Amino acid sequence: VNIDSYTKFNEDGSNQEVKENLTVRRFHAKYHNEVAILKIGIVDKTFADRLLLGFMGGYEYKQTQNASTMDWVYGARYTTANTLMPQLTYEKRFKVLKGLHVSLNGNYNFGKSYSADTASCNYNWLGQSQPKGVPGELSYMKYRYRDHNGAANFRMALFPADGQSVSLSSTLTTFSRSGKDETAYKPTYEHPSQ
């Protein structure tokens, strides 16, 4: 990464901006993603040309090196995500007129995500850190998300004659997210004594 300035951490705890053109190496930008997909089903049966049940499971780990601008440098922020998604695929061709083709595809994700910013220090582009009195490089958090999103698509195509087709398609999508910051202040209410 080419930078034109960086924050120098002095031994007395002070900071100063150094204007210098440097090429530095990213030190906190790892990314890891793995996915396993399993599909099982039947083909060429009287009730279905193709009927598949599937499952996709995935895991992602991503370190965050900088904010949307290069001015904010991070050295410990990261996110993780898990994907658990069942899937269904159905296709059938009927011998009506020149053909009727029906298909249904659907999936639903039961995902979880986690974002963490817990380091009690600041970093510069040289990979050096300086302790600070409060946790969080940007804002202290241990945020857990639950994502539930799904999609279903139904398509029906009719071929009344050569070179002609009529099709109908409908798609349904759904999304919901809930989250909780494990570091958030949780006030307790005490009932006043009588």
Annotate each PLM feature.
Residues 1-75:
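Periplasmic-side early beta-strands and strand-to-turn transitions of outer-membrane beta-barrels
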Residues 13-20, 25, 72-81, 124-130, ...:
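Short, Lys/Arg-enriched charge-dense amphipathic segments
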